[in-house]
Swiss-Prot record:
Sequence repeats lie at residues 134-210, 224-301. The keyword Transcription applies. Residues 1-20 are annotated as: Disordered. GO terms for cellular component: nucleus; transcription factor TFIID complex. Belongs to the TFIID complex together with the TBP-associated factors (TAFs). Binds DNA as monomer. It comes from the Eukaryota. GO terms for molecular function: DNA binding; RNA polymerase III general transcription initiation factor activity. It comes from Spodoptera frugiperda. This is TATA-box-binding protein. Its main location: nucleus. Keywords: DNA-binding, Nucleus, Repeat, Transcription. InterPro entries: TBP, TBP_CS, TBP_dom_sf, TBP_eukaryotic. General transcription factor that functions at the core of the DNA-binding multiprotein factor TFIID. Binding of TFIID to the TATA box is the initial transcriptional step of the pre-initiation complex (PIC), playing a role in the activation of eukaryotic genes transcribed by RNA polymerase II. The gene is Tbp. It is found in: Nucleus.
Length: 307
């Protein structure tokens, strides 16, 4: 009992390693050999991809040299061409497309690149179907001579003179259909023309009539003083709501006048707005002011449209 039989199993103690140092010496050479074979395979694949590159000789010299480093570098196929033989390439996004004169795509691209042609300013409004029409133009001219109104009234056609009622000769012509107020000082006012050209033509005809009566009349300082336009917005308007919202610019007294008087600041135009949708614009010196005033007032009128 005091002597214990030897055990058939060799049980290692706490201080005994699990394998012998001889086994470590066998594992390390095997790992190095496998790593070296793996590096040679990578080099062979790289050389096969390179094909007939000028760097094949350089790769072959690498195969004969033992590799001491774990990491290897194999040049890719895209870098196989020598640097001095490469040409600078323009990036694709910076290249201009080839445009032929006969191709449809080329014509479309040219039309998009070139801006639209400039056109002269034309009257426009918030609603393209509504353009104010000129109804009356008032112009003045200086004949630069003293006039005998009684002589003019006696010898001229279509002329009337009543000094008790009005201190000017009232003369009319048919083409353009206008009326002139001729004063003894030589000043004349022409009204009733529908366009700027007609107003100037009518004033020249009146001056020619005065010349034929023996007066040394000239044609100086012709100027358009007032233009009147009108239009129809084609819908009824709530004038009560408009005067409450825009009381600073408008006045509405239906017992005195059926229209709302709207005094626009810029351009300086006075508008007469009626419940039926009719609008009268007056006070303009040029017709563009009438078009601009209507462009400004139309969205306001549309917001007060009767339902």
């Amino acid at each position: 009992m005091d002597q214990m039989l030897p055990s058939p199993y060799n049980i290692p103690g706490i201080d005994t390693p699990l394998h012998q140092p001889e086994e470590d010496q066998q594992i390390l050479p095997n790992a190095m050999q496998q790593q070296h074979q793996h590096q040679q395979q990578q080099q062979q694949h790289a050389l096969a991809a390179m094909g007939s590159s000028p760097l094949v000789g350089f790769g072959a010299s690498l195969m004969g040299t033992p590799q001491r480093s774990v990491h290897t570098y194999a040049p890719a196929a895209s870098y196989a061409t020598p640097q001095q033989m490469m040409q600078p390439q323009t990036p694709q996004n910076l290249m201009s497309p080839m445009i032929t004169s006969g191709s449809l795509a080329g014509q479309q691209m040219l039309s998009q690149a070139s801006p639209a042609p400039m056109t002269p300013m034309t009257p426009h409004s918030a609603d393209p179907g509504i353009v104010p029409q000129l109804q009356n133009i008032v112009s003045t001219v200086n004949l630069n001579c003293k006039l005998d109104l009684k002589k003019i009234a006696l010898h001229a056609r279509n002329a009337e003179y009543n000094p008790k009622r009005f201190a000017a000769v009232i003369m009319r012509i048919r083409e353009p259909r206008t009326t002139a107020l001729i004063f003894s000082s030589g000043k004349m006012v022409c009204t009733g023309a529908k366009s700027e050209e007609d107003s100037r033509l009518a004033a020249r005809k009146y001056a020619r009539i005065i010349q034929k009566l023996g007066f040394t009349a000239k044609f100086l300082d012709f100027k358009i003083q007032n233009m009147v336009g009108s239009c129809d917005v084609k819908f009824p308007i709530r004038l009560e709501g408009l005067v409450l919202t825009h009381g600073q610019f408008s006045s509405y007294e239906p017992e005195l006048f059926p229209g709302l008087i709207y005094r626009m600041v810029k351009p300086r135009i006075v508008l007469l707005i009626f419940v039926s949708g009719k609008v009268v614009l007056t006070g303009a010196k040029v017709r563009e002011e009438i078009y601009e005033a209507f462009d400004n007032i139309y969205p306001i009128l549309k917001s007060f449209k009767k339902q």
